[in-house]
């Protein structure tokens, strides 16, 4: 089950797991047409998938979706929490209480609700993988990122707490830092504008491998879900070979 299944990392993770014989459940906030396209692409390659439009801000939306999947489709073996929480680059004076709270609800509270819904079920079964995506802001704040950085930092700390409680119960919690620009039209493309995004792809993406490729990221997610419990990864960071790591980078271009 993927929460945050867009055309980038989330959709490619769903596709990767379906390729291995899993039934993928894709959840996203909007764009039924885009969701249908992702499901169709999985089915055309011989996989199976279902999709739901859910707004994680709404009360009970996550909880009801998890129950529906468990009851109508089957037990959730791997949960991928890939929900974005970017509310825009805003100065402190531009960051209203409402905007600050929105970042928290998207990045941290929705993860808490997902964990509260899924992990007790995994605990009863004595197994499961719970994979969580974050960005550079989970490690380092930057001007204009008051809401996003504090919320993503909270997401990382919540992952640590979940790991401390559930790893010994057979549940693999992984915090995955994607430290770089992802070649995804519905995230980076929207942030930059389509024209600028295509220019960037021609200069840094494609054969240059300077953008993080979602299908290659998906390979890592699948590998993490299959790790032997004697050598589990808790935290991992992914970036292009040509990018400086976040601790050596002068700015955060996310």
Please give the residue ranges for each predicted region:
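Conserved mid-core segment of classical short-chain dehydrogenase/reductases
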Residues: 63, 84-101, 144-147
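C-terminal helical subdomain
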Residues: 168-171, 175-179, 183, 193-254
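Catalytic Tyr-X3-Lys loop
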Residues: 93-112, 127, 131, 155
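Conserved glycine-rich Rossmann-like NAD(P)H-binding loop of the short-chain dehydrogenase/reductase
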Residues: 22-37
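Amphipathic alpha-helical dimer-interface segment in Rossmann-like NAD(P)H-dependent oxidoreductases
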Residues: 106-124, 164
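Conserved glycine-rich cofactor-binding loop
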Residues: 6-8
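Residue(s) in the substrate-gating loop at a strand-loop-helix junction
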Residues: 135
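Active-site-adjacent segment of SDR/Rossmann-fold oxidoreductases
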Residues: 140, 161-171
């Amino acid at each position: 089950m993927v929460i945050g299944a867009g055309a980038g990392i989330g959709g490619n993770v769903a596709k990767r797991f379906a390729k291995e014989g899993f039934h993928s459940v894709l959840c996203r906030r909007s764009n039924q047409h885009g969701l249908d396209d992702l499901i169709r692409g999985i089915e055309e390659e011989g996989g199976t998938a279902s999709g739901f439009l859910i707004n994680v801000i709404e009360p009970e939306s996550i909880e009801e979706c998890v129950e529906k999947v468990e009851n109508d489709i089957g037990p959730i073996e791997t949960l991928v929490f890939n929900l974005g929480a970017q509310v825009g680059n805003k100065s402190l004076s531009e960051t209203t209480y409402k905007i600050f709270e929105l970042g928290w609800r998207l990045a941290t509270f929705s993860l808490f609700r997902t964990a509260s819904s899924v992990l007790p079920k995994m605990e009863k079964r004595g197994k499961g993988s719970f994979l969580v995506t974050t960005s550079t802001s989970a490690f380092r704040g930057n001007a204009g990122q008051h809401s996003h950085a504090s919320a993503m930092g909270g997401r990382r700390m919540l992952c640590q707490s979940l790991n401390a409680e559930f790893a010994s119960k057979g549940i693999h919690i992984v915090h995955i830092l994607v430290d770089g620009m992802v070649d995804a039209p519905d995230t980076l493309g929207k942030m930059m504008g389509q024209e600028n995004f295509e220019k960037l792809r021609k200069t840094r993406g494609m054969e240059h491998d300077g953008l993080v490729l979602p299908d290659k990221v998906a390979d890592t997610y699948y590998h993490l879900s299959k790790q032997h419990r004697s050598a589990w990864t808790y935290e991992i960071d992914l970036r292009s070979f040509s990018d400086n790591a976040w601790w050596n980078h002068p700015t955060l271009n996310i």
